[in-house]
Structures are given as structure tokens and as C-alpha cells.
Amino acid sequence: MIPEERLDQITQRFQYLEAAMADGASGSDIAALAKEYSDLRPVVEQIAAWRQLCADMDEARAMLSDPDMKALAEEELPLLKARLPEAEQALQLALLPKDAADARPAMLEIRPGTGGDEAALFAGDLLRMYQRYAEARGWKLELIELQETELGGIKEVVARISGENVFARLKYESGVHRVQRVPETESGGRIHTSAATVAVLPEAQDVDIQIDPGDIRIDTMRSSGAGGQHVNTTDSAVRITHLPSGIVVTSSEKSQHRNREIAMQVLKTRLYDLERQRLDRERSASRSAQVGTGDRSERIRTYNFPQGRMTDHRINLTLYKLDAVMQGDLDEVIDALAADGQARMLAEMGQ
């Protein structure tokens, strides 16, 4: 059942925003109004389409009592009824609550798990996969912290990704990614299993998190590259420790001032993420957990190189195009995860 009262409220709010912008709101007000207007516009369009279809059906039913129009009505009414389920689903999807963080940039963190050198190499493969995906979508990926191994793997990487709907797409990537393949150093041809952990965090804004200067300790140190080699001669790298939570953030750009800015932004993002996780746990106490907001220790995906397949365990999706996936072709799996998340939310709305 579609709530007519809510549809009226949304339509009235949209009309108010339209009038307010036409009257010439100024400064930050106009930006906020324009953002809300843009968000509501597709919803209002779905409302109008659904209401027009309902009106057309009512008109066709009324025509049944008119001998001159009955034949036409009997022809049109089944066609209109056939369009109704699709229109209702489109409207229900438009009415689903939006995650305010979906449009934000994201922090991508990748760390090797079990598997030693092979896990570190796989972490590097995942980074390249996301770099190619970001490039394909026209996003900007900036490396904030990159610690490499002597074999070319990754001990840890933190990157910032900005662009359209970055977090909305990448939030499903958080979790444990497992790889099954024969390492290049394996002379016996045995398949090894290793893993890497991916975390995708929506970037915090100043209004989200306020940090007490007394709660942090800032240390400077020398930047280091692969194998711990010093890559510049000044103590430009910055490490910030948030004492209440124990979170430690580092940044190793050449500018110490820039490193402080970057490290503080990463710290705010991690603290914001902790708060989002707390709220998610509270909400999940009264509803089923949604895909994309689960435990990051959960194994979400397996990349099997000998069989050329990728399996996402959350939705039991298997794709036999591993080479394409590793080259950044992720839309098919992300679209499926997003659709599953929407279906779960629709089911909960109907309970």
C-alpha cells in the first residue's frame, strides 16, 4: 500500500523548494535548497507518473458505462493495469530512505590478511582493481598512505576516492576478500588460499565529528617506502593518535602541513564510521542486517583464479569473468548487491 499522505508531503515540499529558489535564496541556503530539490526531483517524477497512471485507469473504468466508449475502455484498461506493478515498484524504490553518506567521497583501506607474501600481493591486485574501476567511472583516486613490501605487495594502503555516488557504489566492498591461486613462487603448482581486508568509509564532514585537541597526540617521523627505506630527508610524515579510541593515522606526503590536514581528515572519517557502525547495530537490533553494512570480518567474496570465477557469498552470485573483474569490471556485481539491498528494504517496509 502506497501512503498517499506521504506522497502529498513530498510533493508539497518539492513545490516549496521550487518557489524558494525562484524567490532568490542566497548564500549557503541556496546550495542546501538546490541539493534537496535535486534529491526530491526523481521521487516527485515517480509520484506524478504513478498518479497519472491511476487517473488513467479511473477514467477508463468510468468509460465502461458509456456505450460509445466501452469498447475502447475494454481495450485500454488491461494495458494500463499491466503497467501498474512496474510503476508501483519504481515509486516504492524512489521512496526508500536514502543513506545521507551515499553521495560522499570515500576512504578506501586495504590490508593483507592470512597468507603472508601472497596476501600482500593480492592486496596490491585489489588496489589496482579499484583504481581501474574508479578510472572507468570518472572518479579521482588519491593515495594517502601506501606501504609496499619488497616483493611488490602491499602492507597497507589508504586512498581517497571522490566523484559521483562513490560511497553508494563502493560501500558493498567492505569485508574479507579471499583469493585462491597458485603463487608465482610455488614450484609444486599447489593452490594457495589467502585473504585481504577491504574497508570503505564515507568521508566525514566537519559537522559530523568534532575532535577535542586534548584527545589527540601528533608525532612527526621520516617517511618510508618499500622495505622501510627513507624516501626523503625531512621529518615530514605525521602520525596522529586519537587517545580515547586508540585510532592511529599516518600520512607521508612531502609537506608536513598537508600531512596534518590529510591525517585529521582520515581520523575524522574513521571516528564518523565508528558512530555509523554503532547506529547500524542499534537499527539492526529491530530489523534484519542489510548487505553492505555487515561485519567487516565477514568473508564476502572469493576470487578463484584456476577456475576463472568470482563468487560473492552474500548473494550467491558467481561470475566466470575473473580477468575482467580484476581489470575493474565491477558494475555487474555491485548492481546485483544494490538490487538485493533494495529488495530487503522493500520487504521490511511491507512487514
Swiss-Prot record:
GO terms for molecular function: translation release factor activity, codon specific. Belongs to the prokaryotic/mitochondrial release factor family. It is found in: Cytoplasm. The keyword Protein biosynthesis applies. Methylated by PrmC. Methylation increases the termination efficiency of RF1. One of its GO terms (cellular component) is cytoplasm. The modification N5-methylglutamine is found at residue 229. Gene3D superfamilies: 3.30.160.20, 3.30.70.1660, 6.10.140.1950. Keywords: Cytoplasm, Methylation, Protein biosynthesis. This is Peptide chain release factor 1. Its main location: cytoplasm. Peptide chain release factor 1 directs the termination of translation in response to the peptide chain termination codons UAG and UAA. It comes from the Bacteria. SMART domains: PCRF. The keyword Thylakoid does not apply. InterPro entries: PCRF (IPR005139), Pep_chain_release_fac_I (IPR000352), Pep_chain_release_fac_I_sf (IPR045853), Prokaryotic/Mito_RF (IPR050057), RF-1 (IPR004373). It holds the Pfam family RF-1. NCBIfam families: prfA, PRK00591.1. Disulfide bonds: none annotated.
